Amino acid sequence: MSNFSIISDYKPAGDQPKAIDEIIKGLNNKKRSQMLLGITGSGKTFTMANIIERTNRPTLIMAHNKTLAAQIYSEMKSIFPKNAVEYFVSYYDYYQPEAYIPKTDVFIEKDSSINEQIDLMRHSATRSLLERRDVIVVSSVSCIYGLGSPDLYYQMTVNLEPGKSYPRDKLLNDLVNLQYERNDIGFERGCFRVKGDNVDVFPSHYSDKAWRLSFFGNELEYIHEFDPLTGEKLVKLDKAIIYGNSHFVMPKETVNKAISEIEEELQKRIAFLKSQDKLLETQRINQRTQYDLEMLTETGSCKGVENYSRFFTGRKAGEPPPTLFEYLPKDALLFVDESHVSVPQIRAMYNGDRARKEVLVEHGFRLPSALDNRPLKFEEWDNFRPQTVFVSATPSLFELNETGGEVVELIIRPTGLLDPECIIKPATNQVEDLVGEIQSTIAKGFCVLVTTLTKKMAEDLTNYLQELKYKTSYLHSNVHTLERIEILRDLRQGTIDILVGINLLREGLDIPECGLVAILDADKEGFLRSEVSLIQTIGRAARNSEGRVILYADKMTKSIDKAISETMRRRTIQQEHNEKYGIIPKTINRTIHALAELEKVDSKLDKKQTHNLFENPAKLKAHIDKLRKEMLKAASNLEFEQAAKLRDQLKTLEEAALELS
C-alpha cells in the first residue's frame, strides 16, 4: 500500500503544528466533525496536506466553485507529486437543463457541451478511488449529484493479464458494452482499434497513453503502454483494468429489467393522468417515453437517460442516488473548504432541482421517477459524509453546532504577518478622503482595493478616479474569468493601481501588493456588510506587512464592532508570537496559480492571439478542437515531431482552460 508523502521545502510552523496535532487527535478520538478556523495566509492548504499525510487516509476536499477547486488541486498536486491527486467537478462547459414554462407554454430542450479534459479527470478520480488508497480528490459541490453506481461501474470492468486466454470476439463485444467505440482510423480517448493480432485500447482516464494488447490466438501475450501519437512503446504492464467510457455503463440484463420497469411506471402514469382528464399530458408522456424505450431497446441508451437512473441502479423511489461519496472507502476523510459558503450551497441544491422537475412531471414531459435523478438532500449528504474537517476563517452556525462550538485555530502565520490595522472614518465626504489615502498608498508602491455597495457606485467611482488620471479598473460579475485574471495580473504588476468592486471576497484575490482596502458605506448593514463579509474583506490586506483597512462609517454597527474586535484579537495573538520569537513580519510574494497558467499560454502564443483566444469560452474550445485535429493529422502523416509539439501546446491550453473555468 502506498503512503502519502509530502515533497516540500517547508515544515509546519506558526500555529500549524498545534492545529495538525489537535485535528489528528480529534480524528483518532472518532470525532465526526471538527472546525479548522484558518485565517488568510495561515497556510490552510499546507495544514490539510500534513493532516492527510499523517493519517494516511483517502481524502475528499470539497470547494464551493471550480476556480477554488482548481487552485487547491494545483497546490495539492505540487505537495504530493508521488500520490494520486484528482480533480472532480462538473464536466459541462455549458449546461441548459430541460424545463417547461407553463405560463407561456414553452418547453426548453436540454442543451449541453461536455469538456473532454474534465470528463477524463472524473474517470481518473473514480478509477483511483477503486484501485488505490493514496488518493486525494478535490471536488466542487457538484459531487453530490447522481453518478453511476460504483458496484455496476466496477462490475463492468475488463480485467486483463498476460498469459491468460480471452476469446477476441468476446473482448471486442465487452469493449462495446463499456461504450468504447471501434475506430481504426481516428484513434482517441474512448476508442479501440484492431490491427492483426493487436487490439489497441485508449482508456477513458488517459489523454496521452494507450494500451496495446498483443494476442497469439486467444492467448494474451503482452500488454504494452504506448504513446498513441508516435506509437512508441513506453512500458510493459503486468495487468490492465479497463473501466467504462461512461460512469453509467450497464449490463444488458440491467437495461432489459429497467425497460420493463419503465413500461410499468408509464402505464400507471397514463392511468393517473387520464383520471385527471389531462389528455394532452397523457399523449405527451406516452409519446416521449415510448421513443426513449425504443432507443434503450436498440442502443442501450437514449437522450436524457439519466432521468431513468433509478431503474438502472436498483434504487427505490425517494432513495438517494449513488454519488461520488459511495466511491469513497469507509475510513475516508472529508475537508469542506470555505465551509461558510459551501454548506449553504449544498443545502440549496436539492430544492432548485426539485422545483424544475416537478413542473416537467406535472405536465407530462417526464415520469415521476425523474425526480430521483437529483443531487443529495442536505440531510442525506450529512448522513453520507465521513469524518469531516470544516475549514473557514468565518465559520457559520451549522459548523459550530456540529462541533459543539469547539474550533481549532490557525491564526499565527509562519510569515509573522499581522492582521491589518483597521481605521474607522466618517462616511461623509468618503470619496474625497479616499483619494488622499490612495495617493499616499500608491506613493509607497502598493495597490488599493475599494469595495462599494452598488454596481452604479462602483462604475461612477471608477470613472471619477480615471478622470483624476489614476490607473483604475473595475471588477464585476460580467467580467469573464480570463479577463478577471488579466486584471489581477495587471494589478500585481503595477499596470493598474486601484481595483474597484462590489464583492471583493472571491477566492484567489490574495494580493501581497495590496497596501490598502477601503470599505465604503461600511455601516450599511446587510449581506455585503455583515460580520462575515467584513472579516473576509479585511483579510484582503493581510498579505502585506504594511496593509491597512479603512472602514467609512457614520455609526458603529454590531457587524463592524465584531469584525474589528475579531481582527484585533488575531492581530494581538500574532504580535505576541512575533515578540516572543523575534519574528519580523515580511510580505511574501505568492503566485496566483491561474495566473501562472495564463503566463504559460502567453509564452507559447503572442499577446494578441492570447487575448483573442480567451475572449470567450467558445473561441477557446474551438481552438483546442482545431489543435487536436492538427495533432492527429500530423501523427497520421508520420510527422511525429510536429505532433508532439502540438500535443504540448494542446496540453498547456487545456490546463489553462481548467484553471480559468
From Swiss-Prot:
Its main location: cytoplasm. GO terms for molecular function: ATP binding; ATP hydrolysis activity; DNA binding; excinuclease ABC activity; helicase activity. SUPFAM superfamilies: C-terminal UvrC-binding domain of UvrB, P-loop containing nucleoside triphosphate hydrolases. Residues 430-592 form the Helicase C-terminal domain. Residues 25-182 form the Helicase ATP-binding domain. A motif (Beta-hairpin) lies at residues 91-114. ATP binds at G38, I39, T40, G41, S42, G43, K44, T45. Residues 621-656 form the UVR domain. One of its GO terms (cellular component) is excinuclease repair complex. Forms a heterotetramer with UvrA during the search for lesions. Interacts with UvrC in an incision complex. The beta-hairpin motif is involved in DNA binding. The UvrABC repair system catalyzes the recognition and processing of DNA lesions. A damage recognition complex composed of 2 UvrA and 2 UvrB subunits scans DNA for abnormalities. Upon binding of the UvrA(2)B(2) complex to a putative damaged site, the DNA wraps around one UvrB monomer. DNA wrap is dependent on ATP binding by UvrB and probably causes local melting of the DNA helix, facilitating insertion of UvrB beta-hairpin between the DNA strands. Then UvrB probes one DNA strand for the presence of a lesion. Belongs to the UvrB family. This is UvrABC system protein B.
